[in-house]
Structure formats: structure tokens, C-alpha cells
Design a protein with these regions (language model features):
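Short, basic (Lys/Arg/His-rich) helix/loop patches that form interaction surfaces
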Residues: 36-40, 98-107, 117, 167, ...
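Conserved catalytic core of the tyrosine transesterase superfamily
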Residues: 25, 101-112, 138
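Catalytic-site neighborhood detector that most strongly recognizes the C-terminal catalytic loop/helix
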Residues: 79, 83, 144-145, 260-286
Length: 293
């Protein structure tokens, strides 16, 4: 059972592409996978067994020199012991936006874009100008920047069809992106006598390569400290905040899953169960007021 599940879900990955987030998502998918006898889903004990098997395989790969470390180490947390995901409330979101506006336009644009669309930090770094459809106000998410241990950042395509998706922009976000492009064009003209090409990354280094996601993580922590904002937040918290705000507005789970690029709606429901529970309570209260019960 374990080898088949491992091969079906992770068999297309190179060893060096097995990052912690990929492995954690695999465990979460297995929690929703049906048993062979049709009697419900896999038990937590089965998921733990998959983890132990994968750990053994990757430890052998380290011993043979194929990997420098075991990415599955400390990846497994039994269900029910998940750490609460930090999410900014509406008041904190307002403070974050104000703080972003005190940064250079590059950082303001990046952080507002992640908050507005729920992109992963690497997906935002992988965006090119050609991915934006200004008329339809959409962005085609079709690649991401990944930082591997002891290696330079690389750009990779999504591993699943759900990761390759469209996200939608408000008029205000479009205006900010256009302003950022104008600044990029001015900067390129001044420093290199060049123009911005459609194939250029939105957030690029001087050598033309996409910026490292870790650069934005470091800057985000500085912003939190400088503005007395909760230090448990991270760039990824902006993605969680986006999802939580969508749910609070009554957006259904399948739509949220599609926007976030989750392969299964059940993954979204599991991650944001608390937010959906709040919506259920609100719905029940509305019904109670309507019928007087």
C-alpha cells in the first residue's frame, strides 16, 4: 500500500524537488485518500507509516550522496496537533497595507499583490509581464521560483494542473501594477538604456533573473518589527489572510480552492475549517433572525 501511494503521488518528482511543502501536501492528500476496502479514508496510522517509509527512502538517498539532507525530517505532524496558522485580522490588514505603502514601490507592489491574490511567495516572484491580461484584469500563474538548499533559485512549472491557474485583479491592483511597470521602465532607461520586455519578470534582479523569495521574507520581517505588527506573521500569512477574508465574504470552498491552486477542495476545507465554521455560525444566526427561532 505505502509504495504504491508514494509512487503515484511523488513518483514524478526528482529527489532534489521534494521540498517540505510538497511532502506536507502529500501527507494531507493521503488523509483524504480512500482505503482499498472502501471503508472510509486512510487512518492517521497509515499516514504515519507512509512518512516512516518515505523517511527511510530519503535517508538512504542522503547516505548514497544523492541528497545533502532528508527533506522529510520533521515534516510529519499527527492530525489534531497542527499549529494554528497565523492570519491577520481586518485591523491588522489595514496596518499592513499602510506599512507596505511606506516601502519602495517594488516591495509595496509585491506584498499587496500577494495579499490581494493569495499567491504563494514563489509564484509572485515567478510572474512575467506577459502573464498579465490588462483588459481582462487577470494574471496567469504558470511558474514559481524555488530556493533549494545550498543552490541558486530556480524557476519551475507547477506540478499539478490546479497550480496553473488564473487569478483576478481589482482596478486598484491593476493601477498599482501599471505604476510599477512605469517605474521599471524609467529605471531600465536610466541604468541600462533598455526597455521593459514582456518576457521580463515583474520582480527581477539586475542580471534579469527573478528575485529570491527569501529577499521578500527578510523585508517582511523588518516591516513587522518597524511597525509593531505581530511577529508571528509571515509572507505566507498574507496568502492565508486572503483565503480567510474570501471565506468571511461567503465565497464557497471550491472557488477558494481554485484561486489558491489547491488540487482538492478538501485540502482547502481542512486548512481553513475554522474560518468556514465561523461562516456556518453567521448563516445560522441569519436564519434565526429571519424565522424568529
Amino acid at each position: 500500500m505505502a509504495p504504491r501511494n508514494l509512487c503515484n503521488s511523488l513518483g514524478n518528482y526528482k529527489l532534489t524537488d521534494l521540498r517540505k511543502e510538497v511532502i506536507r501536501e502529500f501527507y494531507e492528500e493521503m488523509r483524504h485518500a480512500p482505503r482499498l476496502d472502501g471503508r472510509g479514508n486512510l487512518s492517521e496510522k497509515s499516514v504515519e507509516g507512509l512518512h516512516n517509509t518515505l523517511c527511510g527512502i530519503l535517508s538512504a538517498a542522503v547516505d548514497e550522496g544523492y541528497l545533502t539532507h532528508n527533506p522529510a525530517w520533521r515534516c510529519y505532524k499527527p492530525k489534531g496537533q497542527k499549529k494554528e496558522r497565523p492570519v491577520a485580522d481586518e485591523e491588522t490588514v489595514k496596518k499592513l497595507i499602510t506599512a507596505f505603502e511606506g516601502q519602495s514601490m517594488k516591495y509595496e507592489t509585491y506584498f499587496k499583490l500577494v495579499l490581494a491574490t493569495g499567491l504563494r511567495r514563489g509564484e509572485a516572484c515567478g510572474l512575467k509581464w506577459s502573464d498579465i491580461n490588462w483588459r481582462k484584469r487577470t494574471i496567469h500563474v504558470q511558474r514559481g521560483v524555488v530556493k533549494l538548499s545550498h543552490q541558486e533559485s530556480i524557476t519551475k512549472d507547477p506540478k499539478t494542473s490546479s497550480g496553473d491557474r488564473m487569478v483576478y485583479l481589482s482596478k486598484e491592483m491593476c493601477q498599482l501594477l501599471k505604476a510599477w511597470r512605469k517605474e521599471c521602465e524609467w529605471d531600465r532607461a536610466q541604468t541600462a538604456n533598455e526597455t521593459v520586455d514582456e518576457d521580463d519578470y515583474l520582480f527581477r534582479q539586475s542580471n534579469g533573473k527573478p528575485m529570491n523569495p527569501c529577499t521578500f521574507t527578510y523585508r517582511f520581517k523588518l516591516i513587522l518589527k518597524a511597525n509593531n505588527l505581530p511577529l508571528d506573521l509571515s509572507v505566507h500569512s498574507l496568502r492565508h489572510t486572503n483565503a480567510s477574508l474570501l471565506i468571511a465574504q461567503g465565497v464557497d470552498v471550491r472557488t477558494v480552492a481554485s484561486l489558491l491552486g489547491h488540487a482538492q477542495a478538501s485540502t482547502t476545507l481542512d486548512i481553513y475549517a475554522h474560518a468556514f465554521d465561523k461562516n456556518k455560525r453567521k448563516a445560522q444566526e441569519k436564519l434565526g433572525k429571519a424565522i424568529g427561532l
